[in-house]
Every structure is written in structure tokens, then in C-alpha cells.
Regions:
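Transmembrane beta-barrel strands of outer-membrane/channel proteins
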Residues: 18-22, 68-74, 90, 104-110, ...
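Gram-negative outer-membrane beta-barrel proteins
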Residues: 24-30, 60, 74-82, 98-100, ...
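C-terminal hydrophobic structural anchor segments
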Residues: 93-137
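Outer-membrane beta-barrel "beta-signal"
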Residues: 155-167
């Protein structure tokens, strides 16, 4: 059994929202990003989960001021000690910096981490999207993370090139 309540307020230049979710007996979440998270699956405990989100964007694009997105989640369960989790993210996006419709973005954050973890997982990405013409955009990006899945030394880096066609 589960219920959720969400509230939000949005204006053209900003938005804030919050969600509260309560799960009761026999709930399960099959994915957690840290190794100790596996102990939280398939239990008969109750869980209270809170998510907070906000974004803001400048009135004019093409300036050094980015749009900003932030988020924070927390989850508390009465199943076991140290079973609470937290995560956060921050995203920055600059639009129209070099030419119309281009975007530069940075994002970083902590994947869901359980209390008592001895590692501090961290993830990041950076990209630049540019319009080749009205129908084609190209986005090179790099990304990385440290202590992936809560495992010390399990670091990753990579790159991707995305091409989008609009018809």
C-alpha cells in the first residue's frame, strides 16, 4: 500500500515542488545505488519518502547567468538501523551562449546513498548542444562518477556523441 501527495508552484521564471510518499507493509524497491541498499528490498516496514525540486531561469538567455535546477530526496524506513537514504543533484544550463539555440550544461550530484555507507558516491556530466541546421542538433558530452554503487574505487568516465534529427 502506498500514497503520495505532491504540491508545486510554477511561474514563467521559476518553479518549486515537493512530494511526500508513504509506503506501508510489504513494499519493495528493487534498485538502490549503494551495496547496503539491497537490505531495503522486500520488507514489511513502513517508509516515508520526501522529494524537493526547484528550478530558476534568467529572463534573458545568452548571458553568463545559467538556469539552475536542484533536487533533494530523503527516505526513512523503520526496517533496520541505518536504513535512511539521501540524494541530491544540481544542474546548470546556459542557453544561446555562442549561437541561437545552443546549450551548455553541467550537472553533478550524489546518487541515493544509505546512512552508514563508508563511501561517498558522486556523479557528474558536461555537454554542449549545438544546432547544425533547423533539423539537426549535435550534443557531445562527457560524464563520470566515483564510488559507483557505493563501492570504493568503482569509478567511471565516458563520452557520448548524440545526434538528433527532426522531421
Amino acid at each position: 500500500t502506498s500514497w503520495a501527495t505532491q504540491i508545486g508552484y510554477t511561474q514563467p521564471q521559476y518553479s518549486v515542488s515537493a512530494i511526500v510518499n508513504q509506503k506501508y507493509n510489504d513494499w519493495s524497491d528493487s534498485y538502490f545505488s549503494t551495496s547496503l541498499g539491497k537490505e531495503r528490498t522486500y520488507n514489511d516496514a513502513d517508509s516515508t519518502n520526501i522529494g524537493l525540486r526547484a528550478w530558476w531561469r534568467p529572463q534573458e538567455t545568452g548571458t553568463a547567468t545559467p538556469s539552475i535546477s536542484v533536487g533533494f530526496d530523503t527516505s526513512e524506513t523503520d526496517a533496520t538501523s541505518n536504513s535512511n537514504t539521501t540524494m541530491y543533484f544540481v544542474g546548470l544550463n546556459w542557453q544561446d551562449m555562442f549561437q541561437a539555440d545552443d546549450r551548455i550544461g553541467l550537472a553533478f550530484g550524489q546518487p541515493q546513498k544509505r546512512e552508514g555507507e563508508t563511501t561517498d558516491p558522486f556523479a557528474w556530466e558536461a555537454y554542449y548542444q549545438f544546432q547544425v541546421n533547423d533539423s539537426v542538433s549535435v550534443t557531445p558530452a562527457v560524464f563520470g562518477g566515483s564510488d559507483r554503487n557505493g563501492t570504493a574505487g568503482s569509478d567511471i568516465t565516458g563520452a557520448v556523441l548524440e545526434t538528433t534529427f527532426k522531421f
